[in-house]
Amino acid sequence: MREVISMHVGQAGVQMGNACWELYCLEHGIQPDGQMPSDKTCGGGDDSFNTFFSETGAGKHVPRAIFVDLEPTVIDEVRTGIYRQLFHPEQLITGKEDAANNYARGHYTIGKEIIDIVLDRTRKLADQCTGLQGFLIFHSFGGGTGSGFTSLLMERLSVDYGKKSKLEFAVYPAPQVSTAVVEPYNSILTTHTTLEHSDCAFMVDNEAIYDICRRNLDIERPSYTNLNRLIGQIVSSITASLRFDGALNVDLTEFQTNLVPYPRIHFPLATYAPVISAEKAYHEQLSVADITNACFEPANQMVKCDPRHGKYMACCLLYRGDVVPKDVNSAIAAIKTKRSIQFVDWCPTGFKVGINYQPPTVVPGGDLAKVQRAVCMLSNTTAIAEAWARLDHKFDLMYAKRAFVHWYVGEGMEEGEFSEAREDMAALEKDYEEVGTDSVGEEDEEGEEY
């Protein structure tokens, strides 16, 4: 079996986790108490969904997941919520005091008190696996726990499970709206620390998802539940090939192989289509070509940046539902003829396709319409450098005045870590710039680079 363990860190990670597991349960017909009437093989059968759920002798299905937060309120909602029987109490780990939006608290002072418990529980989950494939880590960049504790966890997971892949789903600070003043500090510190430990990081930003909810679903004031359910659909699409049998299945390492050309350039953009409300879907039939084209619209992206200014290095199209390879091929051929979509010259083909026959499931009473087919596109484009540049600029404005730095130093960090992290980010921006430049005629100087 190729099991995957999900780690949900901090408020954002936990709330994304709630949305994801709610959706997984619906997709597999697992009830909130973990029973699965449709499952005939009692005890650990070799069904595809066992990558995400372990089975007890009593026929209960338990998510292979760990929820961690340094303060209890958010996880307490899971403990008392509708899915409280789904999780083993040991999978829900909370501290007493929160990280207070401070990376240093999450990574050093408060985080180190809880990290050993988390790793111990992770070890228990890993021991139940026959062939652990890797970890999915859900967190935000802006919060103290999401940034600080995640980076500590990633470092420790690298030590304990060296070769296992680690994929992140990270909430990137939105360009305009912000939940914390110190988001740029936390984001840059966490990106720097986890850069060498993460194999692939899918970023979503709240503002981009707000806009999608407003524009496509006509929700005037989207709540976090609306946002998380949309993120849940994306995560579900990415993991569908691990949980169902399909025509072209994609496993965790395959994503990395196809999306990550250089170890540091591992931040693909996610785009999902169709995002459409039930009223509209009733009146239109969306073909494979329609949803494929929608993926190349910047408006449907989960991070605010414009791929038309950048170049694509790799692109992964994950279809689910009523899709046949012939339709996909013609849709891709049509895309390739468009001038607005540019690939780097050293990656001529650039499309990887996955097809899964399980149609997308929607949460009853949710905002998304039930559709016959959907696609999630993961593209590694140089345009994401815009997002880093934006963040670096905000960091610079604050750091020039050393604003708020004393909170970090007071928790045992050194000021040198800030400048080190910022230099690493500058290098990352430069890496993206170099990857985007055409390779012809520059081979001689580039030789010693990689």
Curated annotation (Swiss-Prot):
Family annotation (Gene3D superfamilies): Helix hairpin bin, Tubulin/FtsZ, C-terminal domain, Tubulin/FtsZ, GTPase domain
Organism ancestry: Eukaryota, Metazoa, Chordata, Craniata, Vertebrata
GO BP: any one term: microtubule-based process
Function: Tubulin is the major constituent of microtubules, a cylinder consisting of laterally associated linear protofilaments composed of alpha- and beta-tubulin heterodimers. Microtubules grow by the addition of GTP-tubulin dimers to the microtubule end, where a stabilizing cap forms. Below the cap, tubulin dimers are in GDP-bound state, owing to GTPase activity of alpha-tubulin.
Active site: E254
Protein name per its UniProtKB record: Tubulin alpha chain
Stretches the record annotates as Disordered: 431-450
Cofactor(s) for this UniProt protein: Mg(2+)
Binding site for GTP: Q11, E71, S140, G144, T145, T179, N206, N228
Amino-acid positions noted as binding Mg(2+) in the UniProt annotation, renumbered to this chain: E71
Enzyme class: hydrolase
Site (Involved in polymerization): Y450
